[in-house]
């Protein structure tokens, strides 16, 4: 079976991906912001702290993953953030927009770059 890394695996789609893949026998490495708040546990799932908005957190996550497995078959960059409200132009907070952009756009780039050597395997 394959080794999958899923970011944002503590709830929603990320958690459901993890559950479905675990049921098929895959190994999951879950990146979550708050591992202590994780309600779901499974013997084939390794959970590490990960804040995709933080380069330091991503580097630590990558080191933890590298200490657990020699390669990754699939990376699912699922972690994301949204404000959750519709706003007029006058109401949009530029700082919040930068944070959302950082998490949703730069975050997956950080994670992909940090885990790239493991995704390459023996290639």
Name each model-derived stretch.
Residues 24-39:
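Conserved glycine-rich Rossmann-like NAD(P)H-binding loop of the short-chain dehydrogenase/reductase
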Residues 49-60:
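The beta1-alpha1 cofactor-binding region of Rossmann-like NAD(H)/NADP(H)-dependent oxidoreductases
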Residues 71-72, 119-123:
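Active-site loop of short-chain dehydrogenase/reductase
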Residues 86-89, 93-98:
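Substrate-binding pocket helix/loop in short-chain dehydrogenase/reductase
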Residues 78-85:
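Conserved NAD(P)H cofactor-binding loop of Rossmann-fold oxidoreductase domains
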Residues 111-115, 119:
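Hydrophobic positions on the long internal alpha-helix
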């Amino acid at each position: 079976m394959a080794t999958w890394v899923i970011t944002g695996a503590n709830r929603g789609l990320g958690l459901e991906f993890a559950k479905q893949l675990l049921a098929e026998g895959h190994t999951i490495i879950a990146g979550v912001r708050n591992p202590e708040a994780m309600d779901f546990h499974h013997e084939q799932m390794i959970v590490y702290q990960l804040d995709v908005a933080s380069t330091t957190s991503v580097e630590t996550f990558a080191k933890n993953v590298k200490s657990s497995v020699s390669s990754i078959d699939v990376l699912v960059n699922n972690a994301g953030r949204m404000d959750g409200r519709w706003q007029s132009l006058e109401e949009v907070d530029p700082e919040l927009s930068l944070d959302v952009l950082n998490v949703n756009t730069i975050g997956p780039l950080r994670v992909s770059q940090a885990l790239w050597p493991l995704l390459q395997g023996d290639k």
